[in-house]
Amino acid sequence: MADAPYKLILLRHGESEWNEKNLFTGWVDVNLTPKGEKEATRGGELLKDAGLLPDVVHTSVQKRAIRTAQLALEAADRHWIPVHRHWRLNERHYGALQGKDKAQTLAEFGEEQFMLWRRSYDTPPPALDRDAEYSQFSDPRYAMLPPELRPQTECLKDVVGRMLPYWFDAIVPDLLTGRTVLVAAHGNSLRALVKHLDGISDADIAGLNIPTGIPLSYELNAEFKPLNPGGTYLDPDAAAAAIEAVKNQGKKK
């Protein structure tokens, strides 16, 4: 077992096609845009420039995160390291909101309900029918999951609940070996992890936004608590600007 500090890097996938269109995405599997591919590559360049080179990657089973990991590793010349994919790192399932325009949803339901669905810790959107257009209930990549583990909607509390077992069972053991671990995932699965790492309250987590394509570096002590609370963005100026853009999602038409 290696001694602390342990090195952890979080990377939200680059801009996706539905990010660009301002649609709720969730478990719908969409590609990166050309801009998103550039963001992912830039993320890898930032890792290389900082000398923060991952030894292993954990990502979701959604191609926007998988592709982000691939592009970042290519840019950092670390394309040869192990990559582990798991559904527990998937984006939050947005239920019946999946595929809906955020600005139209805001206009239809009002800001209070919109923000409750989007940012509250424990209020999920309406459930998505199993046979709906944007349902993943019959997706073959989830065939091994019992029905009760295939969500039809989720709040962030649900994401924390399904993500933490993977953190303890898969990511922590890699950190304990002294490996630098890259988690390439999604806005809400990463918010769930940051909530756990930084001990953010259920109320305060609503204000946390994570930008696309900018690595967030943590050093963790022996109890896996941050030595740098909140983490350190490898491009702080770009991160600050991108966080403002994330805050304004839903207002864009």
From Swiss-Prot:
> Does this UniProt record's set of keywords contain Isomerase?
yes
A Gene Ontology biological process term = gluconeogenesis
What Gene Ontology molecular function terms does this protein carry?
A: phosphoglycerate mutase activity
This enzyme catalyses: (2R)-2-phosphoglycerate = (2R)-3-phosphoglycerate
Q: Which UniProt keywords apply?
A: Gluconeogenesis, Glycolysis, Isomerase
Q: Where is this site: Transition state stabilizer?
A: H186
CDD domains, sorted? HP_PGM_like
User: Which Pfam family would be a valid example here?
Assistant: His_Phos_1
This enzyme's EC code(s): 5.4.2.11
Q: Quick check: keyword Isomerase in the entry?
A: yes
InterPro entries membership: His_Pase_superF_clade-1, His_PPase_superfam, PG/BPGM_mutase_AS, Phosphogly_mut1
Fetch the SMART domains from UniProt. Answer: PGAM (SM00855)
Chain residues that bind substrate:
12-19, 25-26, 64, 91-94, 102, 118-119, 187-188
Give the positions the UniProt entry annotates as the active site: H13 (tele-phosphohistidine intermediate), E91 (proton donor/acceptor)
Q: In which pathway does it act?
A: Carbohydrate degradation; glycolysis; pyruvate from D-glyceraldehyde 3-phosphate: step 3/5
- PANTHER family named among the record's database cross-references: PHOSPHOGLYCERATE MUTASE
Describe the subunit structure.
Homotetramer.
HAMAP family, A to Z: PGAM_GpmA
The text of the family note is: Belongs to the phosphoglycerate mutase family. BPG-dependent PGAM subfamily.
Protein name from the UniProt record: 2,3-bisphosphoglycerate-dependent phosphoglycerate mutase
From which organism does this entry originate? Streptomyces coelicolor (strain ATCC BAA-471 / A3(2) / M145)
